[in-house]
Design a protein with these regions (language model features):
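A structural signal for short, well-ordered beta-strand segments and their strand-loop junctions
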Residues: 39, 90-95, 119-123, 132-134, ...
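Non-heme Fe(II)/2-oxoglutarate
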Residues: 1-87
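Catalytic core of non-heme Fe(II) oxygenases with the double-stranded beta-helix
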Residues: 92-95, 99-168
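Intrinsically disordered, low-complexity peptide-like regions
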Residues: 3, 37-40, 108-110, 174-175, ...
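A generic structural signal for short, solvent-exposed coil/turn residues
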Residues: 86-88, 114, 124-125, 176, ...
Length: 233
């Protein structure tokens, strides 16, 4: 088994450190809307706001911390890399994704721009059937353009749909962007939900062996929650 075979798994990681949630939310609200991110690849400017679930903000981009994030939240700045056994310099991009308090229902089907799929929930009070996953028909080894920010159905993905098992309100996890697309579903509007993308690590092909081992070991440990890619029947 390799990370390519795994569509989703919780990661065996240290607990999320304590941080000031209200201060964090305000940082995202104050900084996200005014950030000018070079060559940004997220869909926040492309998708109908009614379908876009997040108040997106960049804590780090191109290897540089934004708006003193690392000084205001030093415990998180360290944790974002250490949770995956990485060094701070390994991580070039950190995207913060608090769900809009007014958002309800299903967002849009998509794959994220990064290949490594390192994720975490700093807080998630809406865990049941809230992260939906559909596998691709082909076992891709690089990120296919056919599943970038797709709305509705796609001829390139299977009909089967999984609901990711969230095992904790604060959870580190892996999410495959090569062999699956996913969508966020909000069942409890107003419930606090903060996801984080740990990105800028390059391709899946160049993933560090230690990180590959962590993902595979985690899928084995959390086998009741892990979702694996299988061919369409």
């Amino acid at each position: 088994m390799t990370p390519l075979d795994i569509l989703y798994t919780p990661i065996d990681a240290p607990a999320v450190p304590k941080f000031e949630i209200d201060k964090f939310i305000n940082w995202c609200k104050n900084n996200g809307p005014v950030q000018d991110i070079f060559n940004r690849k997220d869909a926040s400017k492309q998708i109908d706001p009614k379908l876009y679930p997040w108040n997106i903000a960049y804590a780090k981009t191109a290897g540089r911390w934004q708006s003193d994030f690392c000084e205001q939240f030093p415990e998180l700045a360290d944790y974002f890399s250490q949770a995956f056994g990485l060094n701070e310099k390994d991580v070039l991009e950190i995207i913060l994704l608090p769900v809009k308090s007014e958002f309800a229902g299903l967002g849009f089907w998509h794959s994220d721009p990064d290949e490594n799929g390192l994720r975490m929930y700093l807080e998630n009070q809406d865990t049941e059937d809230s992260l939906l996953i559909r596998p691709t028909k082909e076992p891709h080894t690089s990120r296919p353009n056919v599943v970038v920010n797709r709305q509705g159905t796609s001829s390139h993905v299977q009909d089967k749909e999984y609901s990711a098992k969230i095992i904790s309100n604060q959870q580190v996890f892996f999410l495959n962007n090569l062999r699956a697309i996913h969508a966020v579903k909000t069942n409890k509007p107003g419930a606090l939900r903060i996801a984080v993308i740990i990105g800028g690590l390059g391709s899946m092909q160049t993933m560090k062996p230690e990180l590959k081992d962590l993902i595979v070991r985690s899928a084995q440990k959390y086998s009741d929650a892990a979702i694996l890619w299988t061919p369409e029947q």
